[in-house]
Amino acid sequence: MQHVLLKSKIHRACVTVADVDYEGSIEIPSDLMEAAGIWEGERVLVTSASKGGRLETYAQAGEPGTGKIIMNGGAAHIIKAGERITIMAFAISENPVLPKKIVCNELNEVIRRIN
């Protein structure tokens, strides 16, 4: 039997920009994507710890080391700049998956890895 399992998690990241005029997606610095094992174009679930909103979109790699997490398109109406979010990606597997999880500070720097 196949199961949908958490494979990647960026916890407590902070949205720096919300741009409703962009075509869509969430832009995440490529160094954070790599640390969490999220691929360019991968479907992600984004939840807001600040206001409780949640949505699905796809990940777009941003400039590494900038700390800029940008909500684009319609998603920017749901989750806004300054909100603390969790970004998750999932895998379908017949076997257990050990997720790559990172925790960020308010500057979107990795402060802890949970594995």
Task: Give the residues covered by each predicted segment.
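Long, charged amphipathic helices and adjacent flexible linkers at domain junctions
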Residues: 1-3, 115
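Compact, glycine-rich, soluble single-domain proteins
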Residues: 3-5, 10, 14-16, 20-95, ...
